[in-house]
Amino acid sequence: NPTTGVYEARIAAMEGGIGALATATGAAAVTYAVLNVTGAGDNIVALSTLYGGTFALFMHTLKQFGIECRLIDPDRPEDLPGLVDERTRLVFGETICNPKLNVVDIDAWAEASHALGLPFIIDSTVATPYLCRPIEHGADVVVHSTTKYMGGHGTSMGGAIVDAGNFDWAAHADRFPMMATPDA
């Protein structure tokens, strides 16, 4: 759809990413971003101050797919190595956490994630690219529920996933075969 293509290109440009994917909802954006790099037996690490819908997705729905979510204090990126193992696939946070409204140190979390060979995926729904561009602070993937602040009035539903283009999936092909190797 050319209209969707223009929408995706504009969101990618606003975030400073190389491309974007429009989704039906913000929950779909989060789900696609996570399921794209995980599978049964894998785990993710998420900052503990999450939007309730994302918390339910990570703690209950993903469990049905055999994916574990480990929670971490958003003020302690130095604790990340203790939660990561060979089956960890990503670190997830929110720029401004909903509903607590704590602001996450994106640079510190991106650095901690990258040191362990993991992408840092961040939900920037509350901040929008007008207030914060997480890619400029090291985030690898940015997700949005465009229903809220980007849409401005909540009369339509939508979501988006933006790829920064800076995570080297091929360097970690053992951890991300679906991103770094051809289909079998």
Give residue spans per PLM region.
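Conserved PLP-enzyme active-site core in the AAT-like
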Residues: 20-184
